[in-house]
């Protein structure tokens, strides 16, 4: 089969936003205008197409990143058809991992902001992730019809809170119930959409007289931003020459692709205004797969030789599995992005991360939860494979004759855990299967068995994250489970360097003995300086310990790091320098050196000022003004550090840093303090030393 859409006419985009910015409604409108949906699904009646898991429809929030394909030829049918693959990303902070995962496979993103709420805390998190993956983006300021809507205020927040360089592409005509359309600052025309056909048709009109001055000012700003793309354009602009529409658009596109500016559009998805022009901006300004740098990876040659793959059908096949989902009808769905080459149904490919072959059976393209079966997928496209056996999120799928491992994704460590127990014997077996499958889908979710209590422990990024896991076990796998109290994921570390700590394991009574002897230094590492949180330096001189025993010393210490001497929590941010020791020709063994290392570790840890670290959360509360004092007082009682507050249209926004252990049940307390009028968001910020009384209580509770 030949390619139906040239790769330059592809757009792989994410739509990202804070939880209530109206992202799902925006996506629905995109599907409506691109002709996919004939009836618009509204989130508030639980019918939105993209939100296809039952919990999402009940809670009105988006959990799973669904990928959908749509076609767009422009508001005035001014383009050849472009293929837009939309990855819907969740806006709730517990699902940040989903956003991170989507960012990895996108080429561009649309950031949706609420015209009233502006740049919210989750918007900042998503922004940082988009920066990390260098994703070019445009912004859509939604909900211009709401009370308190202010387009230019949000533009200013994009600048001050995100440190970005926003350039309005449009201005809003009116606001709140008087919002009627937008001014196109490139064409210098007003756009009015037709209410009778839900905004499918529109008219260009003259700019309202009372807006001409403002429009001229922002048009000038837009032209200046375009002129900065090249010296040639700047000379033309400074010489007083007019830039053509094609020059303006080309220059703005170049600057968006270089991540130098953020073009800002506006509208009200709910009122069918603005989404159409935002789609035009996606085509005009966001990259196709050939506009972004080639993907990096390493060759599977034992030497980790760097390599890259370009977005071309002629290169060997390479793809990244970015999401595993369980579909009630077909089982496992593996969403993958093809970076190079072509794959056909029936092909055998290599999972280079696991060194295992997989056969592509059926391939489908998703429209939210409907699916269309296809025979091939080409470079730049996104699809889902049914029934791959052993693929995990982040694995590379590639041509067995040209193996490559694409850059892996990094997933954060969970900060909260709970014990789950099946209610009946029948639930026991099903629970293992269910949790295994859910862990495969979501790398930020972990499952293990506690060795002491023999309980099954599940861990994730927040209370809501784990609630939904338990809920899915019940709905999708019919597993009834009792859930324990949430537990905080503490860590242990040291604050002081200790030198010449000795560890000796010697057993030499008759027969073959055991002998290992090590001398180490232990020292604290700067938090975050080493991704593993641990380093091991071998400084043995003159063979006092033979080379073959060195890995055993490292291993002995690493085993101790899993459960620290203080309270049995993982040890982080410490380094070990092995610099002396001794061995015995006959009696030394790997086991003896492993045991000697663990003895030295325990001995040194006690002397190195051990401390307990607790997770600190970044908390933002929005509350009516009259409740500010109560909310701040309550956060202080929870050992919260107040970081500032600001006035909003809807009340006061309070910024604080609070230990996770103090935040359980906060939603209920906040509701009663403010009669349900306040809301909050919380995300993991850092680990910090727990005060001694808190540490003492935790250590005693662990029975250490």
Swiss-Prot record:
PROSITE patterns: G_TR_1, G_TR_2. Residues 8-290 form the tr-type G domain. This is Elongation factor G. Belongs to the TRAFAC class translation factor GTPase superfamily. Classic translation factor GTPase family. EF-G/EF-2 subfamily. GO terms for molecular function: GTP binding; GTPase activity; guanosine tetraphosphate binding; translation elongation factor activity. SMART domains: EFG_C, EFG_IV. GO terms for cellular component: cytoplasm. Keywords: Acetylation, Cytoplasm, Elongation factor, GTP-binding, Nucleotide-binding, Protein biosynthesis. Gene3D superfamilies: 3.30.230.10, 3.30.70.240, Elongation Factor G (Translational Gtpase), domain 3, P-loop containing nucleotide triphosphate hydrolases, Translation factors. SUPFAM superfamilies: EF-G C-terminal domain-like (SSF54980), P-loop containing nucleoside triphosphate hydrolases (SSF52540), Ribosomal protein S5 domain 2-like (SSF54211), Translation proteins (SSF50447). It comes from Shigella flexneri. It comes from the Bacteria. It is found in: Cytoplasm.
């Amino acid at each position: 089969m030949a390619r139906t859409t040239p790769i330059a006419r592809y757009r792989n985009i994410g739509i990202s936003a804070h939880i209530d910015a109206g992202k799902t409604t925006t996506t629905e409108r995109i599907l409506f205008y691109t002709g996919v949906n004939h009836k618009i699904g509204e989130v508030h009646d639980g019918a939105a197409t993209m939100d296809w898991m039952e919990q999402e429809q009940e809670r009105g929030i988006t959990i799973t990143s669904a990928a959908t394909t749509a076609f767009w030829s422009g508001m005035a049918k001014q383009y050849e058809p472009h293929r837009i693959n939309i990855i819907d990303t969740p806006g709730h902070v517990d699902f940040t991992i989903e956003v991170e995962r989507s960012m990895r496979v996108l080429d561009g993103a649309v950031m949706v902001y609420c015209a009233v709420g502006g740049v919210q805390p989750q918007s900042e998190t998503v922004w940082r992730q988009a920066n990390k993956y260098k994703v070019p983006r445009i912004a859509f300021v939604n909900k211009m019809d709401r009370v308190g809507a202010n387009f230019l205020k949000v533009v200013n927040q994009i600048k001050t809170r995100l440190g970005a360089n926003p350039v309005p592409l449009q201005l809003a005509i009116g606001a709140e119930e008087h919002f009627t359309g937008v001014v196109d600052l490139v064409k210098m025309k007003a756009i009015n959409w037709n209410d009778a056909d839900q905004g499918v048709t529109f008219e260009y009109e003259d700019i309202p007289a009372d807006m001409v001055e403002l429009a001229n000012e922002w048009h000038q700003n837009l032209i200046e931003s375009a002129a900065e793309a090249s010296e040639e354009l700047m000379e033309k602009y400074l010489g007083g020459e007019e830039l053509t529409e094609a020059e303006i658009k080309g220059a703005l596109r170049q600057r968006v692709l270089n991540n130098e500016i953020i073009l800002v559009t506006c509208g009200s998805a709910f009122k069918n205004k603005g989404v159409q022009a935002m789609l035009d901006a996606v085509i005009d300004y966001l990259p196709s797969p050939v506009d972004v740098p080639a993907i990096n990876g390493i060759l599977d040659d034992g030497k980790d030789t760097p390599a890259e793959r370009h977005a071309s059908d002629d290169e060997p096949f390479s793809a990244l599995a970015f999401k595993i989902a369980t579909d009630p009808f077909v089982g496992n769905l593996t969403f993958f992005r093809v970076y190079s080459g072509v794959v056909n149904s029936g092909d055998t490919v290599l999972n280079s991360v696991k060194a295992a072959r997989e056969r592509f059976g059926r391939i489908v393209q998703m429209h939210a939860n409907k699916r269309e079966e296809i025979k091939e997928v080409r470079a730049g496209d996104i699809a889902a494979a049914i029934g791959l056996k052993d693929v995990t999120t982040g694995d590379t799928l590639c041509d067995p004759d040209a193996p490559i491992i694409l850059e892996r994704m990094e997933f954060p460590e969970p900060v909260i855990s709970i014990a789950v127990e099946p209610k009946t014997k029948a639930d026991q077996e099903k629970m293992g299967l269910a949790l295994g499958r859910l862990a495969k889908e979501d790398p930020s979710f972990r499952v293990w068995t506690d060795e002491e209590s023999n309980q099954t422990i599940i861990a994730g990024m927040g209370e809501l994250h784990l609630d939904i896991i338990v809920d899915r076990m019940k709905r999708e796998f019919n597993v009834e489970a009792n859930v324990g109290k949430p537990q905080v994921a503490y860590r242990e570390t040291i604050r002081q360097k200790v030198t010449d700590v000795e560890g000796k394991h010697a057993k030499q009574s008759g027969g073959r003995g055991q002998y290992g002897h090590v001398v180490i230094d232990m020292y604290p590492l700067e938090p975050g300086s080493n991704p593993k949180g641990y380093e091991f330096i071998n400084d043995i001189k003159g063979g006092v310990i033979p080379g073959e025993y060195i890995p055993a010393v490292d291993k002995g210490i690493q085993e101790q790091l899993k459960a620290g001497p203080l309270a049995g929590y993982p040890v982080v941010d410490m380094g070990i320098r092995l610099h002396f020791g001794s061995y015995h020709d006959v009696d030394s063994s790997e086991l003896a050196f492993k045991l000697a290392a663990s003895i030295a570790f325990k001995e040194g840890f006690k002397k190195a000022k051990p401390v307990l670290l607790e997770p600190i959360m970044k908390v933002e509360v929005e509350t009516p003004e009259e409740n500010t004092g109560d909310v701040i007082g309550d956060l202080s009682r929870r050992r919260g550090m107040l970081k500032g507050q600001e006035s909003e249209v809807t009340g006061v926004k309070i910024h604080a840093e609070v230990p996770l252990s103090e935040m359980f049940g906060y939603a209920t307390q906040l509701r009663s303090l403010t009669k349900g009028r306040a809301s909050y968001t919380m995300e993991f910020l850092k680990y910090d030393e727990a005060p001694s009384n808190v540490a003492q209580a935790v250590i005693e509770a662990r029975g250490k």
